[in-house]
Amino acid sequence: MDHKNYLNHVIRGIYNDFQFLVDEGVVERSALDWVHANIHLQDGPASPVTAPAAQPVESSVPLPLPKRKSSVEKRAGSVASAVAAMSLSQNSGEKRTPEEPRKLPGVPAPQKQSEASSVNSSTEKLPPPPSYPGPNTAHKNVERVLAMYDFPGPDAGDLGFHAGEVIIVLEHVNNDWWRGELNGKEGIFPSNYVRLLEDSAVKAQPPPPPPQQNYPPAASSSAPPMQYQQTAYPPQQAPYPPVQAYPQAPQQPIVVAQPTEHKHSSTFKKIGSGLGSAFVFGAGATAGADLVNSIF
């Protein structure tokens, strides 16, 4: 980068810084108009300031840095502070006509003693710039990039790294500068110095399952069944023997006597009744004796 391109690079940074201060309400827009009216870009063809394309890792020649970092990282510099002080003094009623700085190649315009003291006193009265909110760390996805070249990180807030290191991307500040983390350190780095890894979209891991409580194992079904103590009962008495059925005596045929034989008929009746009584008494006595013997 030659001297003219470097001056244009610094002037563009001043424009960006003052635009940020105007948006935050620190200075009036008239100060920004004064900067545009009095600080011009250098004439002549200027090389493009866009970020160059990334080269393979094997190349040892580092790429030129892209355009100036975000205005959040680099606030108003020495030249911006001087112009802001002059703008504030004009708004407070103190009219001054700034002199046109001499355009010397490689040498900035010198400041007078009174102007330097005025700048110091005015900068002390300026309110501090608002703090830049930190990156949102609650990412569902994490981007990882691979460093293609060595980046020393010359400025405060830069994230230095070496070629081959893996960086976690926290925020895309703009198209040219990203914010990342490496070895516990956060900072910004040029996006054309790194290459996005294919497996960078790593989803957040689900929370681990709750610890399981250890319960005693259930009793196996093959265990022997529980034995119950049976109550001993007194032995039962032997059942009574069944009563033997004795065959009945065949019924005697009834003889019908003729009416003429009256005497024989009555005799046969007496004999038949006697035999029946004897049979009944004998059968009953035998059954009764057997029943008494079985009981005792």
UniProtKB/Swiss-Prot annotation:
Assigned keywords, A-Z: SH3 domain
Pro residues composition-biased segments: 205-214
SH3 domain ranges (all copies): 140-199
Cited InterPro entries: SH3-like_dom_sf, SH3_domain, STAM
Compositionally biased residues, Low complexity: 215-235
Domain of life: Eukaryota
Name this protein carries in UniProt: Protein csh3
Organism this protein belongs to: Schizosaccharomyces pombe (strain 972 / ATCC 24843)
